[in-house]
Amino acid sequence: MNGIIPLWKERGMTSHDCVFKLRKILHTKKVGHTGTLDPEVEGVLPICIGRATKLAEYVTDEGKVYVAEITLGKSTTTEDATGETVATKELAEISAEELQAALTKLTGKITQIPPMFSAVKVNGKKLYEYARAGIEVERPSRQVDIYSLVRLDGVSPLTESNPTFKLEISCGKGTYIRTLAVMIGELLGYPAHMSKLERTRSGFFKKEDCLTLAEIDEKMQANDTDFLYPLEKGIESMAKLEIDEEIHAKVLNGVLLPKSLFQTVENEPRVALIFQEKLTAIYKPHPEKQDLFKPEKVIELQQA
């Protein structure tokens, strides 16, 4: 079994829980997810099966879309609704224009510091392990891309009795929406936290493409595997090059290829090689030999 499943991860499960259950449902060990979703977050989680596990990093690299609820006037230890309260502040009225000005400032390339309760590693340990032990450590900042921030709940002002607003966030990989909520609050002069989150898109997969674990189980029991997307779906945004039978045979053996073959795509960081409409391998420019391309991953198995 090879392909990609757009799973709808339900609230209360870890991404690893989903992989564990899918291994049982699909009767295969080769299952991998494409980027962790926190347990209290529901949403699109593409799952790679079989040879598609080789593509997990490329699927993870694609952009994401989230719908978040952000609450002003209270910050928490975890930057979301599960944490303990750190600070509170009564809200004076915040107009839609003031909120929009803050959103505009945070659109584009921004710098974030990951929350202490996160899986980012510092000195070989995950930040949440330090946090649970009550140890504060210096966290590495990271640059992330925020493509758009759109308020979804109208233009009413935010007040003490109405401190929550709904936001659609289109962003690049590695963005912490919890931290973005805190950053919006800081620009408005208030403590803030993310009170709810849903991922509505991950790469090329949207909410309406997804199946739940129960739906996948039901289909498997009926011997129906039409929910599997082909491997090619995972590299939709990657440059592609059609190859002939002679080159195909070389690629299966991981042979270096001349740069001249890649003239139409030579400036791309990586290229998907396609033979008879199927993904065979991913090649990239050789780091030392400028006239050659080398295999990054050979996807298709050589026939015995």
UniProtKB/Swiss-Prot annotation:
Domain of life: Bacteria
Protein name: tRNA pseudouridine synthase B
E.C. number(s) listed in UniProt: 5.4.99.25
Gene Ontology terms describing biological process: mRNA pseudouridine synthesis; tRNA pseudouridine synthesis
Family: Belongs to the pseudouridine synthase TruB family. Type 1 subfamily.
Active site: D38 (nucleophile)
Organism of derivation: Listeria innocua serovar 6a (strain ATCC BAA-680 / CLIP 11262)
Top-level EC class as recorded in UniProt: isomerase
Keyword Nucleotide-binding applies: no
Stated role: Responsible for synthesis of pseudouridine from uracil-55 in the psi GC loop of transfer RNAs.
Keyword terms of this UniProt record: Isomerase, tRNA processing
Catalysed reaction, written as an equation: uridine(55) in tRNA = pseudouridine(55) in tRNA
Keyword Isomerase: yes
GO molecular function terms attached to this record: RNA binding; tRNA pseudouridine(55) synthase activity
